[in-house]
Amino acid sequence: MGPTINCEPTKRGDLVKVTFSLVARNGNARVALVGDFNGWRQGANMFKRRGDTDVASVTLSAGRRYEFRYVDDDGTWFNDEGAHGYAPNEFGGDNSVVDLRDGFGKPDD
């Protein structure tokens, strides 16, 4: 199983719980979820190990798109293969995108 993004509306309706899941990295490597929703701070949203999967959840405002990436213990930044899209960043690469504008992040077919 590759990376997955699950988006669920909350009871408030204007917020969406977004859960990011990754195949657990080798050994005890830790992964951080970083993005425009947390100021790109590496310690703000850490993945938690659940069996052979690393999981992180954030609650975000519906109706917009967010850019994010993952960074592991050794400082390696990487994107989500299951992202809803990608956006160029100022470092010459791309950021992953989760799109909560319509349908709570379900990519177009």
Report the location of each language-model feature.
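Compositionally biased low-complexity segments at domain edges in trafficked proteins
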Residues: 2-3, 98-109
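Aromatic-rich carbohydrate-binding modules that target alpha-glucans
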Residues: 11-65, 73-101
